A protein has these predicted regions:
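Short amphipathic alpha-helical segments and helix-helix/interface helices
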Residues: 1, 147-151, 175-179
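Active-site-proximal loop/helix segments of hydrolase catalytic cores
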Residues: 40, 71-156, 163
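A generic structural motif
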Residues: 129-138, 164-167, 188-199
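Extended C-terminal subregions enriched in glycine
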Residues: 136-142, 159-182
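Flexible, acidic/histidine-containing loops and adjacent segments that form or flank the divalent-metal
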Residues: 1-102, 182, 186-194, 201-224
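Flexible, glycine-rich phosphate/dinucleotide-binding loops
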Residues: 36, 112, 169, 197
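Hydrophobic beta-strand segments of well-ordered beta-sheets in folded domains
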Residues: 9, 25-27, 131-134, 156-164, ...
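Generic domain-boundary/flexible-linker signal
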Residues: 38-40, 145, 171, 199
Length: 224
């Protein structure tokens, strides 16, 4: 429905995608498209006949993160093929724009879902290269990200936000991913069980500046 919303918000359908204009802010839905979403739902662990296969895959992933290796700068190995659950792949990916700031929200999307969103942006002339902030999918899991996705972003002050619990609960975020993000020139910030705020021209409220996460000396091993 592209009717007008309250608070000066208007939804516009542009070709095959939607943009929500709310005052000076713009929200653009990049994915998933209908075909990709339907495929994800059909293959979801929440679809009864698929559940046993997906649970087996997820168990293997968790067990593969038990050991660590030393981090050697410039020599991070990264799997060419990796996957997450179908329900994660169905997450909405959208771009938020406000006064020159671009933030990409990725939900729990995996490699395929992100590629679907990137391809959609390219085909509709939506430039993502100058996005300043990227919310890393699925609490900073390495299974959801490939190097080609990270190489799309070239803004000088590019920053990654990771929403996760405090400490190393559940193996999130991935130390290997954090080290790779640093090598790719991203400033890495993590909630670690707290809340992060970003403000502009706001009065001092006594907040502390979020500390950048630097490279870890060790990281989880890969079973390549």
């Amino acid at each position: 429905d592209c009717s007008s919303y309250r608070h000066n918000c208007v939804c516009l359908k542009i070709g095959e995608y939607y943009k929500l204009h709310c005052n000076d802010a713009i929200f653009t839905i990049l994915g998933p498209d209908k075909d990709f979403y339907n495929t994800c739902i059909a293959n979801s662990e929440k679809t009864k006949e698929k559940s046993s296969n997906v649970k087996c895959i997820e168990t293997i992933k968790v067990n593969s993160l038990d050991k660590e290796e030393q981090y050697v700068p410039g020599e991070i190995k990264w799997p060419e093929i990796d996957s997450t659950s179908a329900i994660n792949e169905s997450s909405i990916v959208f771009l938020f724009e406000y006064e020159g700031l671009k933030i990409l929200f990725t939900g729990d999307s995996g490699r395929n879902g992100l590629a679907n969103a990137i391809n959609f942006a390219d085909s509709n002339s939506i430039d993502l290269s100058d996005t300043q902030i990227i919310k890393m999918p699925h609490h900073g899991s390495r299974h959801n990200i490939d190097i080609a996705f990270l190489d799309r972003f070239t803004h000088q002050n590019r920053t990654c936000y990771i929403s996760c619990t405090k400490g190393d609960e559940g193996h999130h975020p991935s130390k290997r991913l954090i080290n790779l993000l640093n090598e790719k020139g991203f400033k890495v910030l993590s909630t670690s069980g707290s809340t992060l705020h970003r403000s502009k021209n706001a009065p001092d409220r006594g907040w502390q500046v979020a500390k950048r996460i630097e490279c870890y000396p060790t990281m989880e091993k890969l079973n390549l």
